[in-house]
């Protein structure tokens, strides 16, 4: 549950109420005079507002008042008080059902009601002296189910014109640029369809934004990514798919990893046209194997679960293979095994250092024993590469790396590097528990646990990985090409 603290100053005293809001919310109903002690605000019948601790007073045309107990009904959960850089105050209100968004700089009525509510609520929970000024009134919020146009417009307007005079904090006390999304938008992140929305402000009565069928997931999903751990939003091109809020490492596509590791303009892919032909005619009632491959190809733009090729890493020529978990769970079939085998053979002939980035659920069951053969085939050519030619192979394990990949080339590197918090195992937790009838200790299959047991050489964050690889290559006498 998130909380909000509004920097609104109030004082204590006595308050007379001569009316309250009716349940209909669109009209006022008379009520008996109610006196609340310990509040220093008074309204008289002429609608003049006085502060007992102040010398000045002013009048404002106001209808009947509301009692403190009704303030939560009067001020909607969708109303926010903000202050701009010139210390001017505004109220911001939006109505989901009516598709209405309003910014008003004349909200003295609401401000009075809100002050009164804060004061009376605070008095019920405080025993401090009458002369104290109190800040940061605590208000419990509710879940906000916002449509996308409100989400986008509030964010753009706030960042352009208004400095929010409040702090939006999660339970972990992390504050970041996505606080607007986290506080206003629902945690589920579900997007509702919208038709035609107009947003206006009472300051200039002009339309700020008028859009049709605005959907952030359709127009901006190539720019933003959502953390699957804390649901925070971040700009994926800059942050390397590492959540700013919780530090969670999100999965990366193979193309993103290539872009992260290889110098621009130096990538030369290999065997791009190699595709699986369903060698054992695998039968499935749910979805034929051929259809699953076609679907994965359309989703990822890849022909299979690995990309191989050559390029330069800080000027050092390297052979690189990157597995893609989004293609059928990164499973290793005959095509994956053949492409990696050919890459290793090419690196052997050209005497290139080798990097294999692993992200796989293991052998592909739709290809039966042919997928298991790839483990031996890749291990065989790696033996020639490492033992006979004395070349340098670095294995990078990302989350998840399991099954046949872990049991073969994943753990055969001269240097084995893992990403932070990576899930690395041969058999998954569920399989072990069902087989042995014992619980698997929490974190026992995480990279940090494997490092302590000596199964890994290092855990390297993504932002440091390219530099670490460059230093390791130079340590093993692989240097950048001379630039003439």
UniProtKB/Swiss-Prot annotation:
Residues 223-484 form the CoA carboxyltransferase N-terminal domain. It is an enzyme of class 2 (transferase). Keywords: ATP-binding, Chloroplast, Fatty acid biosynthesis, Fatty acid metabolism, Lipid biosynthesis, Lipid metabolism, Metal-binding, Nucleotide-binding, Plastid, Transferase, Zinc, Zinc-finger. It is found in: Plastid, Chloroplast stroma. The gene is accD. It comes from Olimarabidopsis pumila. GO terms for molecular function: acetyl-CoA carboxylase activity; ATP binding; carboxyl- or carbamoyltransferase activity; zinc ion binding. This is Acetyl-coenzyme A carboxylase carboxyl transferase subunit beta, chloroplastic. The keyword Membrane does not apply. The keyword Chloroplast applies. Its EC number is 2.1.3.15. Signal peptide: none annotated. It catalyses: N(6)-carboxybiotinyl-L-lysyl-[protein] + acetyl-CoA = N(6)-biotinyl-L-lysyl-[protein] + malonyl-CoA. A zinc finger (C4-type) spans 227-246. Component of the acetyl coenzyme A carboxylase (ACC) complex. Biotin carboxylase (BC) catalyzes the carboxylation of biotin on its carrier protein (BCCP) and then the CO(2) group is transferred by the transcarboxylase to acetyl-CoA to form malonyl-CoA. GO terms for biological process: fatty acid biosynthetic process; malonyl-CoA biosynthetic process. Pathway: Lipid metabolism; malonyl-CoA biosynthesis; malonyl-CoA from acetyl-CoA: step 1/1. Its cofactor is Zn(2+).
């Amino acid at each position: 549950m998130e909380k909000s603290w509004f920097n609104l100053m109030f004082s204590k005293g006595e308050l007379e109420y001569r009316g309250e809001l009716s349940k209909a919310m669109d009209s006022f109903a008379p009520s008996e005079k109610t006196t609340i002690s310990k509040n220093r605000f008074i309204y008289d019948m002429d609608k003049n507002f006085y502060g007992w601790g102040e010398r000045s007073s002013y009048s404002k045309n106001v209808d009947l008042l509301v009692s403190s107990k009704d303030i939560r009904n009067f001020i909607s959960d969708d109303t926010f008080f903000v202050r701009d850089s010139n210390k001017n105050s505004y109220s911001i209100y939006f109505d989901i059902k009516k598709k209405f968004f309003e910014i008003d700089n004349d909200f003295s009525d609401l401000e009075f009601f809100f002050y009164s509510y804060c004061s009376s609520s605070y008095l019920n929970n405080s025993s401090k002296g009458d002369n104290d000024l109190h800040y940061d009134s605590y208000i419990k919020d509710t879940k906000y189910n916002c449509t996308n146009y409100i989400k986008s417009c509030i964010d753009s307007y706030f960042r352009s014109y208004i400095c929010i005079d409040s702090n939006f904090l999660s339970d972990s006390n992390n504050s970041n640029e996505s606080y607007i999304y986290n506080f206003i938008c629902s945690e589920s992140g579900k997007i509702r369809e919208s038709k035609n929305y107009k947003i206006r402000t009472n300051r200039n009565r002009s339309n700020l934004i008028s859009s049709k069928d605005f959907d952030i997931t359709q127009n901006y999903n190539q720019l933003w990514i959502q953390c699957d751990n804390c649901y925070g939003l971040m700009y994926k091109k800059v942050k390397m798919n590492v959540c700013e809020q919780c530090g969670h490492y999100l999965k990366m596509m193979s193309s993103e990893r290539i872009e992260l590791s290889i110098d621009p303009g130096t990538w030369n892919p290999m065997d791009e046209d190699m595709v699986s032909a369903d060698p054992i005619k695998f039968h499935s009632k749910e979805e034929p194997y051929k259809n699953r491959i076609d679907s994965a190809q359309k989703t990822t733009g890849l022909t299979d679960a690995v990309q191989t090729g050559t390029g330069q890493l800080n000027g050092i020529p390297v052979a690189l293979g990157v597995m893609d978990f989004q293609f059928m769970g990164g499973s290793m079939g005959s095509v994956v095994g053949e492409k990696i085998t050919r890459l290793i053979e090419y690196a052997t002939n050209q005497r290139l250092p080798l990097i294999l980035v692993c992200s796989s659920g293991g052998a592909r069951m739709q290809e039966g024993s042919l997928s298991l053969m790839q483990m031996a085939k890749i291990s065989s050519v790696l033996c020639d590469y490492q033992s006979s030619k004395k070349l340098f192979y670095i294995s990078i394990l990302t989350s998840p790396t399991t099954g046949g990949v872990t049991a073969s080339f994943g753990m055969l590197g001269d240097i084995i590097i893992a990403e932070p918090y990576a899930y690395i195992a041969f058999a998954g937790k569920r399989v072990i528990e069902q087989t042995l009838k014992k619980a698997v200790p929490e974190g026992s299959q995480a990279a940090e646990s494997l490092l302590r047991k000596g199964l890994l050489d290092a855990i390297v964050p993504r932002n440091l990985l390219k530099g670490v690889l460059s230093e390791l290559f130079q340590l093993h006498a692989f240097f950048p090409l001379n630039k003439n």
